[in-house]
Amino acid sequence: MHRYFQIAAALFLATSFALAPAIAYDTELSDTAVREAYFLGQRNDDKTRAFFVPYTKHLSVPKKGPYISEIRLLTPLAQVIQISSQTTSGYSAQQARLDYQQRGDSLLLVVHIEFTPTYGQIEAAQASGDASKARGITLRPDDFWQSFRYGIKQKADWIDPKVIRGEAEYGGADSFGRGGLVGAWVYVEYDAHNVISNDVDVSVFTPSGEEIQTSFDLTKLR
């Protein structure tokens, strides 16, 4: 009988470890976890930046087309730290907790698109008899990022996003106070409970159909 219980206990532990990767990473954050994340964000120093290293991928400049320069995958904890680091004036730990409760447990995919010499603010240009009038020139719209597709998958299964939003990015203003469009930041939000703590493949598809890929190991993220 004693031998039976030893075997049963061993099987239970083996099963538990086998299921471990499917258990969500840090969700349902405690007040203490949110508070510690808040203070790490408020530091906004080398320690804060070091935290985000495994959450960020920097990609190479393509030979042509738009430049997907940066991809981030932020867990609920990482989002608390990021928001705190961006709101250092008049932002309290209590507000960080309220913001987290309102936001819920989400996984945030962040994509930075930058223009290049072959994919810029001018979308198309047609021949014109009077070049000085610049006829036939079409400027890329502020919401150009909507012509891209974004997604994450695990074991070939795509995960449905909750929300997709984007923000146009502008360059320095000229003498008339106008700044040109230079890119965009795109934010894709997922329910963290739909993403297991395992490898995640990220894909960004350009308007021309090119796929830019990277991956993250959620077992190494908090």
Per-range role (PLM):
Residues 1-9:
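Bacterial N-terminal signal peptides that target proteins for export
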Residues 8-18:
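Bacterial N-terminal signal peptides
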Residues 23-222:
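Conserved functional micro-motifs across diverse proteins
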